[in-house]
Design a protein with these regions (language model features):
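Extracytoplasmic
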Residues: 29-504
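Extracytoplasmic/periplasmic substrate-recognition and gating elements
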Residues: 101, 301-302, 795-869, 896-899, ...
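C-terminal capping/gating helix-and-loop segments adjacent to ligand/active sites or protein-protein/ligand interfaces
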Residues: 446-459, 470-473, 477, 504-508, ...
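Hinge/lid segment of periplasmic solute-binding proteins
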Residues: 532-546, 609-662, 685, 717, ...
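Extracytoplasmic "Venus flytrap"/periplasmic binding protein-like
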Residues: 572-644, 668-679, 776-780, 787, ...
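Periplasmic solute-binding protein
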Residues: 616-619, 638-683, 707-737, 751-752, ...
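Glycine-centered hinge/linker elements that transmit conformational signals in sensory
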Residues: 736-766
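Long, aromatic- and glycine/proline-rich binding clefts that accommodate carbohydrate-like moieties
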Residues: 807-809, 858-916, 920, 948-959
Length: 959
């Protein structure tokens, strides 16, 4: 009876709510095709490779040349002489061919990435009409970069980062498993007979010369290679040693692989205790599988056998050994050069390439010039990592099934009989426990420092065994079970990051005495005193070093890791280009107080959204409108991005960041339940009872307000009221912004709808979206698109199981869906007291430019990882970030529907009063209309008072 009453209540609530959504009387859209198509991880390349592991390897090569290709009708063309094909975004090239014999073929591509936005070209390979595995879809091809010239110095004597320029040249490369968990190159199993293979270009454009299907390459054992050397008569060269500085590269795969610096050791070459010397390379920038750096090994005196030693430090990934494949003249010489290990250590170390017996392993070099390439790999632990990854997926799937029965807070006095309700649950636990034990055993068999890390895996295996022994305790220990999955996910993510810093590499003969990688005691003492006394003489806050007397002071509301990136950009780009020195400081609050005290900066970047108008109305800021080039500057941003920073018809702030809401959804859960991705608020309401029957819910954004956030954050990103208001055709203020426009019926309807989400449907007001989304308890939620960063990094247990879409909208009379929403962000401003306003404008113009924002976003993300992706307001820089084509399309579509809201003197009272009305309805059961009307009157009284305080003309001066 209670269930019946509950069901009727939900149905009644749904019927009551429908009138509050404009356009819901129109025919409901057919959204069945919008149910996520998700088949688990059965389509991963790791699974594909495992399935064909016992198939015979191919013994011939199939070459598919440009001359034989069939092209898409548009967006692709053959070049003169049929030597290559140019494929634009959206175009494709296709081959029909025959395999004379069944076998496993690896895939190689000869291509040239044409100049574009600088993103990695993405391709999709279709084999006989279908994509064979996930990794063949949106596969990223690397570009090639080099230093534009030698390392130069600024006026202070600090080394500058050399400009990174793209090298447009042909690359002949096998396609690597970018996920890195199969331990091999991408491949296809071909049955004997005719086949079709299509290469589609998903982003950027490229030239394709050929695609080859070839037998898998094998690396010779050290013994085999030694025998080959002996058979060919190669002899060890004597009396040779040369140091090659690691920062002086030949080429590299990514623009972020620029020279870095180390001032912690006087043994680093080159060294200076005070000045910045770009003397190392790598660190966290060089950590993703497939990234590579190449070196020109010149001045080799004669053909023969040489040894290679690296001076390195791996202090970024604590307790982890990282790995590199070393290629010499295009191939890995022997097993010793495959997965060369670099163990963790806080100090500098040396590593000579050794064979399986621990003896130095030689490599054959020719006289003159040779090429050495180092490529990031995951090492010998890749199979164990794949096993852990598979277990994480299965354990997470089982957790979702259990929560659908018990809910998020199980009744501790009830026996849910989960082992009976979920057929095969205990068998699944046993299977995963065995898999984890096997993964741990593999780690232990490899030995070394990695042995201790198997404890992270064993802990979850033991937890599963405990649940098998006592099934009735499962519901009481769900949180512990979930914590175990999260721990495994964190462990796996940490293992896939492979950072390494290098000072130099040495090519030498056997028996040569190598320089010590570490400084002596007296060198360390000297270094300490030199740096200590320099700290009293050097101004480390002022960067640039031009010696200009018209330098500027900039305060940045930004993280300390990010401020270092800005300093690098100022030193390497802004000051050399303009001759203007910059004093940078991290300051997050106190702009008004500092300005009133006469101690404020010349420029502030990252200023909170509500502050520019707050300062402009007090005559504390300069407007940008009178500067030449301002009209072009505005084109860098979306149409309404400058609206929050305009006052009395002038612009006082330039957008730095811009954020907005997106809808996040779990592909696996929605697919299993047959639920479509909600496109309208009607869809949301129809989805609620389906989820609630399985103890799940939907998350809507709401931020608790405070005095500070009311001023700083503005109106757009606090909750859904602004979104609903805009979709209903409403607005916050009248034309001259002297009063609100919240007395309209659109405003009342939006407020009522927003309140009903919580009063009628019981949506949670405050919750941890990341955690509940990861666990599956909240498979649909609306949050800032920055949540993408968090989920990409921290929620490895649901990697590939979630997606992102525009926010739900309101159906218009013409049947289209209005997904308008408000936004949030920060700005750059120039203070009126600035001594050199023109220099300040040049800085803001430079800082918000396409190139600077792109360089900044790239550097920050490579330093902090995907979790540090910067929410730039610059459209070109935003598009250059490593989104997939689908992600960028979704974000761009939603961004085009962001309508920024104006800020006015007293607007802090608007967000506070609307929140007061909302909480009165939610907690005190007040009448929505009466409460909203009362607070609206209070808002207008405060706006009028504020205008009188600032001496504004009530009749027409506007804001």
């Amino acid at each position: 009876m209670k269930r019946l009453q509950s069901g009727l209540s939900v149905l009644l609530a749904l019927l009551i709510a429908l009138p509050f959504f404009p356009g819901t009387t129109a025919a409901a859209q057919d959204t069945d095709q919008n149910v996520p198509d998700y088949s688990g991880r059965s389509d991963s390349f790791a699974r594909y490779a495992a399935a064909i592991a016992d198939r015979p390897a191919a013994d011939t090569t199939i070459s598919l040349n440009a001359a034989d290709a069939v092209l898409s009708p548009t967006l692709s063309e053959k070049l003169e002489g049929d030597s290559a094909v140019r494929v634009e975004t959206g175009g494709y090239v296709e081959w029909t061919f025959s395999a004379d014999k069944s076998g496993v073929y690896e895939i190689g591509l000869s291509y040239l990435a044409s100049a574009g936005k600088g993103q990695k070209p993405q391709i999709t390979l279709t084999f006989d009409g279908s994509v064979p595995y996930t990794e063949a879809s949106h596969y990223e091809l690397s570009r090639v970069y080099r230093d534009a010239g030698p390392i130069e110095k600024n006026a202070k004597g600090d080394d500058l980062i050399p400009e990174q320029v793209e090298v447009e040249r042909w690359q002949d490369r096998p396609l690597l498993d970018t996920a890195g968990l199969s331990g091999r190159n991408l491949c296809l199993y071909l049955e004997e007979g005719a086949h079709t293979l299509r290469l589609a270009c998903e982003s950027e454009s490229l030239y394709v010369r050929s695609l080859s299907l070839f037998p898998g390459t094998t690396v010779s054992s050290d013994a085999e290679k030694a025998a080959s050397y002996q058979q060919n008569g190669y002899q060890s060269v004597e009396g040779f040693l040369k140091i090659y500085q690691a920062e002086k590269t030949l080429e590299k795969s990514d623009v972020v692989l620029y020279p870095t610096y180390d001032r912690t050791s006087p043994a680093t070459i080159p060294y200076d205790p005070v000045r910045i010397r770009r003397n190392t390379i790598g660190k966290g920038n060089w950590s993703e599988p497939g990234m590579w750096i190449s070196y020109l090994i010149d001045d080799i005196p004669s053909d023969g056998l040489y040894y290679i030693t690296f001076k390195f430090r791996q202090a970024d990934a604590i307790g982890v050994t990282t790995f590199r494949n070393v290629y010499v003249n295009g191939s890995i010489p022997s097993k010793a050069y495959e997965n060369v290990s670099f163990p963790y250590g806080v100090d500098w170390n040396q590593k000579t390439v050794v064979d399986e017996n621990g003896e130095p392993c030689p490599v054959y070099l020719t006289a003159g010039e040779n090429e050495l390439l180092m490529e990031v790999s995951l090492g010998p632990y890749v199979e164990a990592m794949r096993m852990v990854d598979d277990s994480i997926y299965e354990l997470n799937r089982l957790y979702t099934q259990m929560v659908m029965i018990t809910g998020t807070t199980p009744d501790s006095y009830r026996d849910y009989e989960l082992d009976k309700e979920i057929p095969g649950l205990l068998d699944a636990f046993r299977e995963q426990a065995d898999a984890l034990y096997a993964a741990a055993a593999l780690f232990e068999s490899l030995g070394g420092e990695e042995k201790s890390q198997s404890e992270d895996i064993l802990g979850m295996a033991r937890r599963l065994e405990s649940l098998i022994r006592d099934p009735r305790s499962i519901q009481k220990r769900l949180s512990s079970y979930r914590e175990g999955i999260s721990a495994l996910s964190s462990w796996l993510y940490d293992r896939t990051s492979q950072p390494l810093e290098m000072d130099y590499l040495i090519v030498h003969s056997a028996g040569q005495e190598l320089p010590s990688p570490r400084a002596s005691f007296w060198q360390q003492v000297s270094h300490f005193f030199k740096t200590f006394f320099a700290s009293f003489l050097e101004d480390y806050n002022t960067v640039g070093g031009s010696g200009s007397e018209e330098g500027i002071t900039v305060w940045a509301n930004i993280g300390r890791d990010q401020i270092q990136v800005i300093k690098n950009l100022v030193v390497d780009q802004f000051t050399p280009q303009t001759g203007i020195d910059v004093t940078l400081s991290v300051v997050q609050t106190g702009f008004i107080e500092a300005t009133l005290a006469g101690r404020g900066p010349d420029v502030a970047i990252g200023m909170a959204r509500g502050q520019p108008v707050n300062l402009a109305c007090r005559n504390a800021l300069l407007s940008f409108d009178s500067y030449g080039g301002f009209e072009d500057m505005k084109k860098r941003f979306s149409d309404t991005a400058l609206v929050p920073y305009q006052y009395n018809g002038k612009t006082y702030g330039i957008p730095c960041t811009q954020t907005f809401f997106m809808l996040f959804y779990r592909k696996d859960i929605l697919s299993e339940m047959g639920i479509a991705i909600p496109q309208t608020w009607t869809d949301i309401m129809e989805t609620v009872p389906k989820l609630q029957r399985s103890h799940m819910t939907i998350g809507l954004p709401y931020a608790v307000i405070s005095a500070a956030t009311a001023v700083d954050n503005g109106l757009g990103a606090k909750d859904l009221f602004a979104t609903l208001l805009l979709q209903n055709g409403g607005t916050f203020y009248n034309e001259d912004h002297s009063a609100t426009a919240l007395d309209s019926e659109a405003s009342m309807s939006a407020f009522k709808t927003w309140s009903d989400f919580y009063t009628k449907y019981g949506f949670d007001l405050v919750y941890d979206f990341y955690t509940r989304f990861s666990t599956g308890e909240m498979p649909i939620g609306i949050a800032s698109y920055e949540m993408f960063n968090t989920l990409s990094v921290a929620a490895q247990e649901i990697r590939g199981l979630w997606g992102m879409a525009p926010v739900p909208g309101t159906i218009r009379e013409d049947g289209t869906v209005d997904t308008s929403e408000a936004g949030a962000g920060s700005a750059a401003v120039i203070f009126k007291k600035a001594a050199s306003p023109d220099n300040c404008y040049r800085f803001v113009d430079w800082w918000t430019s396409d190139k600077t924002q792109t360089d900044f976003c790239t550097a920050v993300e490579n330093q902090l990882g995907p979790g540090g992706r910067y929410a730039t307001a610059n459209l070109a820089a935003f598009s250059s970030q490593p989104w997939s084509p689908e992600e960028l399309e979704m974000l761009t579509t939603q961004r085009e529907n962001v309508i920024e809201l104006p800020e006015i003197p007293g607007s802090y009272y608007v967000s506070r009063s609307i929140d007061n009305a909302f909480r009165a309805v939610l907690y005190d059961k007040k009448n929505p209309r009466e409460t909203f009307e009362k607070e609206n009157r209070n808002i207008n009284e405060e706006i009028a008072r504020k205008r009188r305080e600032l001496g504004l003309d009530n009749e027409g001066k506007g804001r």
